[in-house]
């Protein structure tokens, strides 16, 4: 994979790995297409369709035991909108008030962007216009949170090559956590004991192999 920084990667292989490691505000039901609670246990939408209030799951934790908070999402969204990071998907958040202006340098004040932590577990999002598909967009990895202290311990907010994504450094909030990464060989993820829905995670480990040949891939399942 290119990497496992959800604000940097762009490929399908990376997505397959990241959905095991990270979790956004919502998660998709692949059978029905319904948007299910993820890091947010519930949400409300204003009558004009422009304000969203997310109540975060108070049992949601990072793999190191830290609680997943509204401020984590505010900082993470500021990160993807930081132009010097060079994310390929900042426009995923352009539906927010002031987001495009912040990303393009019209304003340097992130307080003007429509995302606020009302309290520890309440996130308010203000959109420029009603966007019925906004909730569905939140299942895209570019909107997922990253662990601020881990990122900054190993680099700056806009560091594309920070060591925070390496085994032993990577702190995530999904059902699995990073166990090992053998370059050009395999990535192993293991069940995250701090995941809020831990008991429903039926696998103890998953192994991801880089396979570019369809025939090779087919033989691996025989």
Locate predicted features.
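N-terminal lobe/hinge region of extracytoplasmic solute-binding protein
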Residues: 1-47, 171-172
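Short, well-ordered beta-strand elements
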Residues: 1-2, 41, 51-54, 73-76, ...
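Short Gly/aromatic-enriched secondary-structure transition segments
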Residues: 7-16, 71, 137-143
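Sec-exported extracytoplasmic/periplasmic mature domains
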Residues: 26, 30, 61, 78-86, ...
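Gly/Pro-rich hinge or "lid" segments in bacterial periplasmic/extracellular proteins
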Residues: 29-30, 110, 126-207, 213-215
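Aromatic- and charge-enriched surface segment that lines or borders ligand/interaction sites
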Residues: 41-91, 124, 217-222
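Residue-level recognition of beta-strand termini and adjacent short loop/turns
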Residues: 46-47, 117-119, 183
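Surface-exposed binding/hinge segments that line
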Residues: 55, 74, 81, 85-153
């Amino acid at each position: 994979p290119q990497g496992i920084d959800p604000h940097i990667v762009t490929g399908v292989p990376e997505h397959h790995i990241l959905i095991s490691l990270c979790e956004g505000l919502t998660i998709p039901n692949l059978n029905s297409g319904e948007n299910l609670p993820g890091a947010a246990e519930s949400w409300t939408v204003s009558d004009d369709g422009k304000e969203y209030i997310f109540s975060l799951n108070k049992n949601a934790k990072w793999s190191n035991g830290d609680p997943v908070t509204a401020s984590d999402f505010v900082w993470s969204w500021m990160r993807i909108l930081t132009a010097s990071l060079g994310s390929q998907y900042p426009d995923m958040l352009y539906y927010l008030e002031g987001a495009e202006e912040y990303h393009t340098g019209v304003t340097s004040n992130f307080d003007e962007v429509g995302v606020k932590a009302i309290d520890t577990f309440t996130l308010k999002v203000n959109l420029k216009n009603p966007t019925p598909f906004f909730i569905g967009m939140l299942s895209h990895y570019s909107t997922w949170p990253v662990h601020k202290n881990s990122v900054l311990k190993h680099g700056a907010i806009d560091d594309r090559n920070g060591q925070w994504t390496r085994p032993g450094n990577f702190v995530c909030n999904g059902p699995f956590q990073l166990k090992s990464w053998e370059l050009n060989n395999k990535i192993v993820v293991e069940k995250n004991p701090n995941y809020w829905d831990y008991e429903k995670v039926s696998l103890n480990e998953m192994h991801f192999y880089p396979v570019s040949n369809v025939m090779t891939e087919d033989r691996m399942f025989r």
